[in-house]
Swiss-Prot record:
Its EC number is 2.7.7.87. It comes from Shewanella baltica (strain OS155 / ATCC BAA-1091). It is found in: Cytoplasm. Residues 3-188 form the YrdC-like domain. Required for the formation of a threonylcarbamoyl group on adenosine at position 37 (t(6)A37) in tRNAs that read codons beginning with adenine. Catalyzes the conversion of L-threonine, HCO(3)(-)/CO(2) and ATP to give threonylcarbamoyl-AMP (TC-AMP) as the acyladenylate intermediate, with the release of diphosphate. It is an enzyme of class 2 (transferase). One of its GO terms (molecular function) is L-threonylcarbamoyladenylate synthase. Belongs to the SUA5 family. TsaC subfamily. PROSITE patterns: YRDC (PS51163). This is Threonylcarbamoyl-AMP synthase. The keyword Nucleotide-binding applies. Its main location: cytoplasm. It catalyses: L-threonine + hydrogencarbonate + ATP = L-threonylcarbamoyladenylate + diphosphate + H2O. One of its GO terms (biological process) is tRNA threonylcarbamoyladenosine modification.
Length: 188
């Protein structure tokens, strides 16, 4: 498994690779959100059913506009999300019609976050788009907290490990329904 810095990982992602990378709280698994084959590989590695959907992380909201149907959100709903970003808040937002079922699962919405983590920001800026994100663990197990755990659990299953440090968060992000304001998962 290649171990690379964020600036060196772009080609692997754009060629359909699945990567592990540090986030605010845990290591994540990620891939190109526009490549269904890569998303299916990520789901297989994690042993996660596609119906559950995935999260997109981005360096700014502009990167999410290809996936989120902002016309279904009020100015107040968007302002609330913007007041929490960048940061450890994931918002469930309506999707555009073309979004892959492997991203949104069985829902008509998608979970999105503008990350404050420098490494995630660098990855998304290098790609000029968001990154699929899910915790680096097999379904039902604890997420990886170290590069050593990634190497032990995912060697031969993913294409690269992004070097870097975890952020300061010790809990997963809070998930909020952007339309109703309801907290779906209490995080940090």
């Amino acid at each position: 498994m290649l171990q690379l810095h964020p600036s060196d990982i772009k080609d692997i992602i754009l060629q359909g690779g699945v990567i592990a990378y540090p986030t605010e709280a845990v290591y994540g698994l990620g891939c190109d959100p526009d490549n269904d084959t890569a998303i299916q590989k990520l789901l297989a590695v994690k042993q996660r059913p596609w119906q559950k959907g995935l999260i997109l992380v981005a360096s700014d909201f502009q990167q999410l506009l290809a996936y989120v149907d902002e016309s279904q959100l009020t100015a107040e709903q968007l302002e609330f999300a913007f007041s929490k970003w960048p940061g450890p808040f994931t918002f469930v937002m309506p999707i555009k019609a073309h979004v892959s079922k492997y991203l949104c699962g069985e829902f008509d919405s998608i979970a999105v976050r503008v990350s404050a983590h420098a490494g995630v920001q660098a990855l998304c800026r290098a790609l000029n788009k968001p990154l699929v994100s899910t915790s680096a663990n097999l379904a039902g197990e604890d997420p990886a907290l170290t590069a050593a755990e990634i190497l032990a659990d995912f060697t031969g299953k993913i294409d690269a490990l992004v070097l870097g440090e975890l952020g300061e968060q010790r809990q997963p992000s809070t998930i909020i329904d952007a339309r109703s304001g309801k907290i779906l998962r209490n995080g940090q």
